[in-house]
A protein has these predicted regions:
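Asp-box/BNR beta-propeller blade signature and adjacent active/binding-site loops
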Residues: 1-340
């Protein structure tokens, strides 16, 4: 944060676990993922939903509730929790309008700003002006030269006639680049896996010393009926080419899919792959990965390294669970690297 404190944000949903539960209207349910349609416990309609911000001023030892912003949706959230601090101290986060089933927003990805340290957030700023492109931004990163990149996915769609399950096999990994320090002027999507046999919007990057990007993708393969047949993780090097990047050949990784990839370039020079199953590092642009002798993280982790070298990784217990099945507690891993 601008004041050197730490902030973590997550989605919290509360309400009755048993008894009466409201269901979303059929015209809304028909657009949503199969789980929300078929399993009432995945429908969050009628529950109290909020993005909850916790703040720490002692390096993550203790946390206090700082602020929250509420929303209402049949979905279990609308933001992957990626927030970046701009040069002027403004916070910028990404969200999905397609997940805000009860709000007057376009069904596509957008950005929001906070100029008061996450106490309040501004109106949606849509990532793409193309009303027939549905975007899924998941990560915002600041590069060493000050530029910003957003990674996620996108797919063409009819905003008046679309269904989530039909979009998934068409959604390919892409990125948006901003040369403006205010984070307002974004490029068209740069697709990096559009010729691949897999789809998804979840991927992350780590900047290499020469400006190239090491990228790790969650890769989902669908059959002709839209059924998932395989999931794993792939990787590539995005070679810097002026103000953009060109994707190299895509190869397998030694990792299971494990949800959203998370990469962290460390002060020690290695890049960490942070995941629930394990933490692994590479010093050769991803050609080899070495597993660390330490526990994995919570699901869908976010990681950062403090000035003293401590690495904090925050995730949650459980998976993409129905409401009330699992206490999806937020957990934190504290890690220090030892160079030998």
């Amino acid at each position: 944060m601008p004041d050197s404190s730490l902030m973590v944000v997550f989605t919290q949903v509360t309400g009755p676990r048993e008894g009466w539960r409201q269901r979303a209207p059929k015209e809304i349910l028909k657009r949503l993922p199969a789980a929300q349609q078929d399993i009432p416990e995945y429908d969050m309609t009628g529950l109290v939903q909020e993005n909850l911000h916790l703040r720490s001023t002692d390096g993550g030892e203790t946390w206090a509730r700082f602020s929250s912003d509420t929303f209402s949706s049949a979905m279990n959230g609308y933001s992957e929790g990626s927030v970046v601090v701009l040069a002027d101290g403004t916070l910028l986060r990404a969200g999905w309008g397609q997940s805000l089933t009860y709000c007057d927003v376009r069904p596509t990805g957008f950005l929001q700003r906070s100029t008061d340290g996450a106490k309040t957030w501004g109106s949606p700023e849509y990532l793409s002006p193309d009303t027939n492109l549905q975007t899924f931004p998941t990560r915002i990163r600041r590069l060493r030269d000050g530029r910003l990149i957003i990674t996620g996915g996108a797919a063409p769609f009819d905003p008046d006639n679309w269904q989530w399950m039909n979009q998934l096999p068409k959604t390919h990994h892409c990125m948006w680049v901003c040369n403006d320090a205010t984070g307002k002027l974004w490029s068209d999507p740069l697709y990096v896996t559009d010729e691949a046999e897999f789809a998804c919007e979840e991927w992350d990057t780590a900047e290499l010393g020469n400006g190239d990007l090491l990228a790790v993708f969650r890769a989902i393969i669908y059959d002709n009926t839209g059924k998932v047949t395989k999931q794993d993780r792939r990787q590539t090097i995005l070679v810097q080419n002026g103000q953009a990047w060109t994707a190299g050949s895509i190869s397998q990784t030694p990792f299971p899919h494990d949800g959203h990839p998370e990469l962290l370039r460390t002060r020690e020079g290695v890049i960490l792959h942070v995941a629930p199953t394990a933490l692994s590092w590479t010093a050769d642009r991803g050609q080899t990965w070495t597993r660390l002798d330490c526990p994995g993280t919570g699901y869908y982790p976010h990681a950062t390294q403090l000035e003293d070298g401590t690495i904090l990784a925050v995730g949650h217990v459980g998976n993409d669970d129905p409401y009330g099945k699992t206490d999806q507690a937020i957990v934190l891993n504290r890690i220090r690297l030892e160079v030998r």
